[in-house]
Regions:
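NAD(P)-dependent Rossmann-like dehydrogenase/reductase catalytic/cofactor-binding core
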Residues: 1-206
């Protein structure tokens, strides 16, 4: 059971990314429409908590562990359980992802893991500042990069993470919790839907 996985991801790219890592770790990934009774159900959701993700993908919550694909898996891995996840499934997932010496954190059920929630909210706040015309996109990124020592500004960071992906994270967190803190800014929503850069300023009306 520790080496048999059933994957559920948001995209073909995510499926391939996770499959390559699991192959390197020595896990066997099952094919077919339904997981076998002994398989660990590994889900890589954006924005959802593990319970919602297990329900959406139609897998057994007792055998479900979620993994965050938003961040660099070569540096750290975050796993999330449902309230029903069996201890042996949690232990199997942790042992597998720690097999190559990379650090693994296991968290309880929560919308957006940790990194997804923090990064989406930081980018969304920067988008809201741009929408309010407090500063230009370039100035927002420069202020954060130079003032806080970030490697890149939040809008550039949002572009690298994917505006559409961040929109999905925020919308799902808002849907599950009802918390208005997760409401996507108009700046983010419009650019995500149009496939535009978050650093693209509004056109002049003159």
């Amino acid at each position: 059971p520790a080496n048999t996985m059933r994957l559920a991801t948001e995209s073909a790219d995510d499926q391939q990314k996770l499959a390559v890592l699991l192959d390197a770790l020595g896990a066997q990934v099952e094919e077919g429409d339904r997981p076998s009774e002994q398989a660990l159900c590994l889900i890589a959701p954006y924005g959802d908590d593990a319970t919602t993700a297990a329900n959406r993908f139609g897998v057994d919550a007792a055998r479900t562990v979620c993994v965050d694909l938003l961040t660099d898996l070569s540096r750290h891995r975050t796993l999330m359980m449902t309230p029903a996840t069996r201890p042996d499934m949690r232990a199997a997932a942790h042992a597998l992802f720690a097999r190559d010496g990379v650090g693994v954190t296991v968290i309880r059920d929560s919308v957006g893991f940790v990194a997804q929630r923090v990064l989406a909210m930081v980018v969304n706040l920067a988008c809201d500042i741009a929408q309010q015309r407090i500063a230009s996109p370039e100035d927002i990124d420069q202020a954060v990069r130079l003032g806080l020592g970030y490697p890149q500004g939040p809008l550039a960071w949002g572009d690298s993470l994917g505006p559409r992906r961040l929109l999905t994270i925020l919308e799902r967190m808002l849907n599950v919790t009802g918390d208005p803190r997760y409401r996507p800014s108009h700046w983010l929503r419009r650019r995500a839907l149009l496939g535009l850069s978050l650093r693209l300023d509004e056109p002049s009306t003159i």
